[in-house]
Amino acid sequence: IDSITQAVVKDNPKIAERKGFKNIFVNAPCVVCIAYDTTYDMAQIDCGLLGENIILAAWSRGIGSCCLGSSARWILDSPSAKPYLDRMAFSKNYKLLYCIALGYPDESPEAKPRRQDMIKFMD
């Protein structure tokens, strides 16, 4: 986690300017990287369902999570991170889609208020 963070920050130093920054995975101690089959048109949906199951299973064990699209984009866009991406050894035609940060929560923030103006019920 630390070395891939250093590689990404080398190419994009502004990332490290965030308050409390430790790594590109929201300071999580563990990360799962999800890759999709670029030849299958429903692969991204399947990966979303996979991630949901990982997140729910982790929560049932008291482990918090955060789904991260930006971390995956930073890795894909960073030439310095290419060796780490290569070490992930995804199968042919597979591409990194997103990451899931995992760890024991150290806070319990209140839920944000729901925007009722964004909800529409239809009969």
Where are these regions (language model features)?
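Acidic, surface-exposed loops and disordered segments
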Residues: 1-123
